[in-house]
A protein has these predicted regions:
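Short hydrophobic/aromatic patches on the structural cores and recognition surfaces of FHA
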Residues: 16, 48, 72, 88-89, ...
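Ca2+-coordinating acidic residues in Ca2+-binding motifs
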Residues: 47, 64, 103
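C-terminal flanking helix
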Residues: 66-69, 73-80
Length: 176
């Protein structure tokens, strides 16, 4: 049996695909948890519970987190979110997960076309300033990486007299 593939599109309007089929979750906190774990790797349970449910008491936040993990794994049909120990959460390293952010950050100049807008563009979590702040930081980070890569490509294209590509990258920069 082929291994399931979870693909996250995070640059521009975000979406989640399981084996080429888009997955829609019943509440945004599931998406937020997946996005946060994918970008940050292993995180402390209390940290993520506090970020996603900052207006709730600790016990309620932890209960909500457990339910969110259960719902995510149930809807995705497997153990995608795991707890290597009682205090840490991560995406399962044995599962196949890929994203546009990974490809883009590994080789930005080669993957400029993946930058289709701000990180998690249009994604909003009600009552979660900490999550919104994190998203803002990530947006700045990826936008700066994009701008740097565009300038690098412009230099390369200028040196090779590839005016068509240079014009395309200038248009990318102007669109920001």
């Amino acid at each position: 049996m082929a291994k399931n593939l979870l693909r996250l599109k995070l640059l521009g309007s975000p979406s989640v695909f399981l084996n080429q089929e888009e997955v829609f979750f019943p509440f945004a906190k599931i998406n937020a948890l997946l996005y946060y774990l994918h970008i940050n790797g292993a995180v402390n349970r209390e940290e993520i519970a506090g970020i996603l449910w900052e207006n709730k008491d600790n016990q309620t936040a932890k209960k909500n987190l457990r339910n969110t993990i259960y719902q995510a794994n149930k809807l995705l049909g497997g153990e995608w979110i795991v707890a290597p120990n009682r205090t840490v959460l991560s995406l399962n390293p044995e599962c196949a997960i890929e994203s546009d952010v990974e490809l883009f950050t590994d080789h930005p100049a080669e993957h400029l076309s993946l930058y289709q807008g701000d990180f998690l563009q249009g994604f909003y979590l009600k009552d979660s300033e900490a999550f919104d702040y994190w998203v803002s930081k990530m947006r700045i980070r990826y936008e700066q990486l994009y701008i740097q890569a565009c300038y690098q490509q412009l230099e390369t294209e200028k040196d090779h007299l590839d005016l068509e590509e240079a014009e395309r990258n200038l248009r990318r920069l102007i669109s920001i």
